[in-house]
Amino acid sequence: METNKPTLYWSLLMFKDWNFYIASTLKGLVFVGSQNKPIEELFEWARKRFPGSLLVEDDDKLEPYAVEITQYLEGKRKNFTVPVEYAGTQFQLAVWNALCEIPYGQTKSYSDIANDINKPAAVRAVGAAIGANPVLITVPCHRVIGKNGSLTGYRGGFEMKTLLLDLEKRASSEMDVPH
């Protein structure tokens, strides 16, 4: 098989009211889907990002990722240790890495992220890169809000963004979560 067409392994993560698809290659997590979206969301993303790749359902291969995401949803995990395989431009990678630096339970604005990557005039491009983040939750784009503190767009939808931010605020105030 060609190296540019990796096999994508996928699973449906179900925890309480949370249901979303996750996918990985042998190198790491590549996709965390939106809350309660059909599998077509994953298939459409895979066709664009990894055209011609084989998609294989494999709960066992996805178990390490599912465990950490579930721990996060339980309020028992602040940081992720599973590998993530980023597939994006250098600019997108810079933005996604900056997102991973936002502390658990805190938020930043799009202009904060633009400043963090030394591109203060690139606020709109930062927004586009955040919108292209394929790995929700583990690359915490839900922690980015408007400069005035308002909730802004999120691939998973406003309800999912609100739930994630509330989860982090609640978990941060209730206990000191181990890393």
Swiss-Prot record:
Keyword Methyltransferase among UniProt keywords: yes
EC number(s) from the headed UniProt entry: 2.1.1.63
Induction, per UniProt: Up-regulated by methylated AdaA in response to the exposure to alkylating agents such as MNNG.
GO terms of biological process kind: DNA repair; methylation
UniProt GO molecular function: methylated-DNA-[protein]-cysteine S-methyltransferase activity
SUPFAM superfamilies, sorted: Methylated DNA-protein cysteine methyltransferase domain, Methylated DNA-protein cysteine methyltransferase, C-terminal domain
Family per similarity comment: Belongs to the MGMT family.
Protein name in the entry: Methylated-DNA--protein-cysteine methyltransferase, inducible
Organism (species): Bacillus subtilis (strain 168)
Classification lineage: Bacteria, Bacillati, Bacillota, Bacilli, Bacillales
